[in-house]
A protein has these predicted regions:
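RNase H-like (RuvC/DEDD) metal-dependent nuclease/polynucleotide-processing core
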Residues: 1-233
Length: 233
């Protein structure tokens, strides 16, 4: 799991990777412990937006799609979140179940799912779903390949490319991992929401809602390059 905090200082975007072992988390992730750690860290940093790369909810039976949520169709995600317990491919099931549970735990701790687009610009705290591949595309950059397909030096090359586009400084830039860079690029949407003018923000999907004891649908929030017409206030 890659974690990265972002803030703005005098127009500069400052990013700092955070290693989970330093926060006391080791071994196989557990949703309750991870949610508690994320919330504690966010409160220490004074953050109000937390981005999670993973599905926040299951498919609505009435969305007109066979296998996926609306946001997944719009962004062409490789994994599809179907009705509760059903995923495509089936090997994604443990990850998706974990992600939905993580969002549930975050909501219990006071960090709910985003209810609508207007709420994004309020002063409220939210746990937001991200999709780093779409974040790269939204910035008109080629996505970072999957970890297994990323050649040596590619993470540093992509970080340099991102730094040429936006005013970013990264603590320990030479040691940034694949997952941390993915967390960084996804988190740029939060920087845009908080008023940084270097990029905008877009939402895919529809508002989340509860049905038969489980959450369905939801928004995926991504950064967007302002000079392409893709950015939305």
């Amino acid at each position: 799991i890659g974690v990265c905090s972002l803030r703005t200082v005098s127009g500069q975007i400052e990013a700092a990777p955070i290693r989970l072992p330093a926060l006391g988390l080791t071994g196989r992730p557990e949703a309750t412990a991870l949610a508690t750690t994320i919330v504690d860290l966010a409160e220490q940093l004074g953050a109000r937006l937390v981005f999670i790369d993973g599905p926040q909810a299951w498919k609505s039976p009435e969305n007109g799609l066979v296998h996926s949520r609306i946001c997944e169709r719009q962004l062409a995600t490789p994994g599809k979140t179907g009705l509760p317990g059903i995923t495509k491919p089936s090997t994604y099931a443990p990850f998706i179940v974990f992600a939905v549970e993580l969002f549930d735990q975050l909501a219990t701790l006071g960090w709910p799912r985003l209810p609508d687009a207007l709420a994004l610009h309020s002063a409220s705290r939210f746990a937001l779903e991200s999709f780093p591949t779409a974040a790269w595309r939204g910035l008109d950059l080629a996505p970072l390949p999957g970890k297994a397909k990323t050649p040596a030096g590619a993470v540093q090359a992509k970080l340099a490319e991102l730094s040429r586009l936006l005013p970013i400084s990264v603590e320990g830039a030479g040691d940034v991992t694949h997952d941390e860079l993915q967390a960084l690029v996804a988190g740029l949407a939060g920087i845009a929401v908080e008023g940084h003018t270097s990029c905008g923000v877009t939402l895919a999907g529809v508002a989340p809602f509860e049905l038969e004891g489980t959450w369905r649908e939801g928004f995926i929030v991504n950064p967007a390059r302002r000079n392409t017409g893709k950015a939305a206030e």
